[in-house]
Amino acid sequence: MDTMGRHVIAELWGCDVDKLNDLSFIEQVFVDAALKAGAEVREVAFHKFAPQGISGVVIISESHLTIHSFPEHGYASIDVYTCGDRIDPNVASNYIAEALKATATEVVELPRGMGPIQLEKPKVKVL
């Protein structure tokens, strides 16, 4: 293994506003994303803000998945961090982007535990 983990940071734009503000939907999507990636779910905690927006985390044996949604902007900020090399965090990230109906994504993947971080240009995809 070359890294201690892989950390995907994704900006999701043009998301379905109603889905971004649906606590049950977001929670289920994140649990499903973790399972589809092959992760083992340990704990789930999500909070809906008034008047809108959701923040949450799915703790997995391999690390975590997080979201901060901004329905008023059709935007979600997500992180998927997996330790080791058994699970591809992009599987979960892509599943979440599709479920939220994102029309554009910007994704950066960071290798973790390798010393100074060297950022590559983000991968931008217009869907």
From Swiss-Prot:
Gene Ontology cellular-component terms listed: cytosol
InterPro entries linked to this entry: AdoMetDC_C, AdoMetDC_fam_prok, AdoMetDC_N, S-AdoMet_deCO2ase_core, S-AdoMet_deCOase_pro-enz
Protein name listed in UniProt: S-adenosylmethionine decarboxylase proenzyme 2
Record's keyword annotation contains Lyase: yes
Textual note on the cofactor: Binds 1 pyruvoyl group covalently per subunit.
Catalysed reaction, written as an equation: S-adenosyl-L-methionine + H(+) = S-adenosyl 3-(methylsulfanyl)propylamine + CO2
Keyword Magnesium included in the entry's annotation: no
Subunit structure: Heterotetramer of two alpha and two beta chains arranged as a dimer of alpha/beta heterodimers.
Active site: 63, 68, 83
BP term (GO), one: spermidine biosynthetic process
Gene Ontology molecular function: adenosylmethionine decarboxylase activity
PANTHER family: S-ADENOSYLMETHIONINE DECARBOXYLASE PROENZYME
Site note Cleavage (non-hydrolytic), residues: 62-63
Alphabetical list of HAMAP family matching this protein: AdoMetDC_1 (MF_00464)
Function: Catalyzes the decarboxylation of S-adenosylmethionine to S-adenosylmethioninamine (dcAdoMet), the propylamine donor required for the synthesis of the polyamines spermine and spermidine from the diamine putrescine.
Family: Belongs to the prokaryotic AdoMetDC family. Type 1 subfamily.
Source organism per UniProt: Halalkalibacterium halodurans (strain ATCC BAA-125 / DSM 18197 / FERM 7344 / JCM 9153 / C-125) (Bacillus halodurans)
PTM (free text): Is synthesized initially as an inactive proenzyme. Formation of the active enzyme involves a self-maturation process in which the active site pyruvoyl group is generated from an internal serine residue via an autocatalytic post-translational modification. Two non-identical subunits are generated from the proenzyme in this reaction, and the pyruvate is formed at the N-terminus of the alpha chain, which is derived from the carboxyl end of the proenzyme.
